[in-house]
Amino acid sequence: TIKDLQRKYNDIPNFHLTTGKIFVDGVLEGDPLSTPPMLPNAASLSDYLQPVFYQKEGIDLVQIERYIDPRAPECKKYFDLDTDKFIKLHKFHPNQCIESKGVFEHDLEFIENYTAALHGAGINVHSHTIGDRAFRAAIDAFESAKKMHPTSQGNFSVSHAQVIHPDDKPRLSDIEIFFAFTYSWIE
């Protein structure tokens, strides 16, 4: 158990198991200019937009021409053509027809159970969240752990929190979450 780990390493000077970290999701950065375009994998509440870019000759600036509608007729033909024919005909990669909301690093049950176990042992829980779906999963787990272990001395913190859905903002003070923002990403 977590308490056993704490006791096992308790005699090591300057080493204390006081905080456990969980990666709820991955990164927001994708590479839409690669072939095929690579989407971010941060867990989002809504599907990622799939841009088609253009670049004027002699100018380094890349601009968005349009976004792909995955429900459009050309995307219905996604499996009918090979990749090169699809790109030539439709001017975008067929993988851009695939809808994605990103992924969690672990399933939700693990996130909730791990958070509850740490909090129940009085250990601080630090969750890495980028997308708004990941942030919501983390604070849902915090709320659940707090209800299960109301006398725990463990705290909750979140790193990055690049995207927070407005509906989740009022919950933050009730849960008492500490934040570790990455300030270089603010602007």
Q: Model regions: which residues?
A:
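Active-site neighborhoods of metal-dependent hydrolases
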Residues: T1-E187
